[in-house]
């Protein structure tokens, strides 16, 4: 959904575009919060790649899609022929550090649930932290949140935020280091497209 306008500008008569939604988000099946791990997301997306029986692909990944997608491709390395990377990262921090004040706040048990599930919907507030707030209309915010609430996946955004490693000993750190090591071995055409107004990764 995030890249719907980008896809409209691609030569769809020449390329096949596949945009999987992360399991537990969108209209996918409900995933218990405890199952949102880097390893599981990698395994799930790799299963999608296998099911589609793809021969080769050019990968575009942003945010969590970067490491999860690369991790999935590390399990099927012959597929990857090129990459476009957008505001994402690979590897794990070598010191204790929070990605953002929001991540620092919601990682605390109970506090995170209170903020994201009781006090307000994070989708209603995302426009406040966008480089172009006008692009985040009420209708768009509702479309982002609707599948999560309709499918009982309201805990998924918080679980994904807590997956972000805040230090070398975080539960996600080992998987992220492996992804970073894999990326270092790649010798493929690649482009980096960076949005400087990204409030988290810009």
At which residue positions do the language-model features occur?
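Conserved HGGG/HGGXW glycine-rich cap/lid loop of the alpha/beta-hydrolase fold
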Residues: 1-27
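Flexible "cap/lid" subdomain of the alpha/beta-hydrolase fold that forms the substrate-access gate
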Residues: 25-55, 60, 64-202
């Amino acid at each position: 959904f995030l890249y719907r306008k980008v896809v409209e500008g691609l030569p769809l008569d020449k390329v096949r575009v596949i945009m999987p939604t992360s399991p537990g988000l969108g209209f996918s099946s409900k995933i218990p919060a405890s199952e949102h791990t880097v390893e599981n997301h990698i395994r799930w997306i790799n299963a999608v790649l296998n099911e589609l029986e793809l021969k080769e692909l050019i990968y575009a990944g942003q945010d969590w899609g970067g490491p999860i997608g690369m991790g999935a491709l590390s399990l099927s390395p012959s597929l990857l022929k090129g990459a476009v990377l957008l505001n994402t990262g690979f590897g794990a921090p070598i010191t204790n550090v929070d990605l953002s004040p929001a991540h620092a706040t919601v990682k605390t048990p109970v506090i995170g649930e209170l903020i994201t599930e009781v006090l307000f919907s994070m989708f209603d507030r995302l426009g406040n932290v966008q480089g172009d707030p006008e692009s985040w209309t009420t209708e768009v915010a509702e479309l982002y949140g609707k599948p999560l609430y309709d499918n009982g996946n309201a805990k998924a955004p918080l679980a994904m935020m807590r997956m972000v490693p805040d230090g070398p000993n975080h539960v996600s750190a080992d998987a992220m280091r492996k992804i970073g090591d894999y990326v270092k071995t790649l010798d493929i055409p690649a482009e980096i497209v960076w949005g400087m107004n990204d409030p988290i990764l810009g």
